[in-house]
Amino acid sequence: KYSRKDNPAVELMRRVIAAKKKTDLSNHDYYQYDKYQKITLALNDLKKEQLEGKFFSKRQYLLDQVETSPYNGKLTLPVSIDETVSQHIYRKDPKTEKDIIKGQQSNGIGQVIQTGEILNTALKDAFTDVDIYDDYVRLLQYPFPSPIGRTGISFYHYYIEDTVYVERDLCYHLQFIPANSQDFGFRGELYVLADSSLHVKKCNLYMPHNTDVNYVKNMKIEQEYTRLDNGEWVLSKDDMIAELHVNSVLQDLLVVRNTRLTDYAFDELPKILFKGKAKVRHDMDAMNRDEAYWNKYRQVDLTKSESSMDSFIHQMENSKGFKYIIFFVKALMENYVEIGGGTDGKKSKFDLGPVNTYISKNFVDGIRLRLAGRTMAALNPHFFWDGYAAYGTKSNDWYTGNIFTYSLNKKKNSPFEF
């Protein structure tokens, strides 16, 4: 039976949690670092029978895009990649933090559906940065107790496995699991430096299989910390691998987020950098960086399929039946279908959807048929309409609804974008 009393693992973790204050970067008056992030979305776990089937065998460009993922060893088909280079700056007094986007580019399926930018934003929001030195880790819109957070001792069970060397550093190797298997928490392992700093050198976090969160089938987070010349330990590597399963009909998805943090500095920063309330600022040329820029600042190499994404999309756009494929993809990903534009470079003025509401069934209406749609910013960037008409085949009743929205700010696609 697990006991916290006189437990060496618990006593060690109490010391690790207490030592957090000494190693907090916010103790400095200023700090900054550079950050590179790559997020890849791929069809996951493709089977040999699928690839030999009629759909793939008739589309060589799809077969050429298939590769074995280095993260799960499964056959995958990358469909989008988003890269961002940014600078994070911090000032203690008055407390201010900002991210300055230096470079950003997106390639893939988002290029051929007008709201692809929303897809990239949603992925970044769901698979956000993880800092185990926070008390809670917000992930997939849920707060998870950190294994070294203030509630860690009561939430997790810890077990010392051994003392091992990680690179050249002697570390305590610990395993941890939620005390209650039904709770939202991680399981995983920590490698804690066996010196006075008691800082985490490396950690692996896993989403328990019985945690039913936003279609996540499996998730792993790998983090590594690096010692700076001044003796401080800082996060340098943060990778996240998530396998998503929606249902038995749709293909599983793989999301891989690679983050690298470099060039930490603690010099005083000019006041002008902190001007304004916006927490995120874009450099003027951030969206127009050339290949030489990305070759210089890319911290994680692209896979063969990621690097050929432009060619893949070009072949897809020129393939037979492309419009039908995009129709299906958009219906699945966004629940809306563009009417006019979208595939020829022009933005849609009107979308049909939500598609999953077109046919439904209930006790009163029997089979209920519904037609719905919405206007887009290409029609008017300030004024939007969203409405529907539905008919119950059993009740013979008609139902209608209309929503009118006016946006003060000019929108690119829909009234709900940020």
Description of each model-found segment:
Residues 2-173, 177-186, 243, 247-360:
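Structured extracytoplasmic
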Residues 13, 189, 222, 370-372, ...:
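Membrane-embedded beta-strand positions in outer-membrane beta-barrel channels/transporters
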Residues 29-31, 348, 367, 381-385, ...:
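Outer-envelope beta-barrel architecture signal
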Residues 35-37, 387-391, 418:
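Transmembrane beta-barrel strands of outer-membrane/channel proteins
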Residues 176, 204-208, 350-361, 371-372, ...:
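Transmembrane beta-strand segments that form the barrel wall of outer-membrane beta-barrel proteins
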Residues 188-194, 220-230:
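Extended lipid/amphipathic-ligand handling interfaces
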Residues 195, 230, 378-380, 409-413:
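Outer-membrane beta-barrel channels and translocator barrels
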Residues 215-216, 244-253, 405-418:
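Outer-membrane beta-barrel translocator/channel fold
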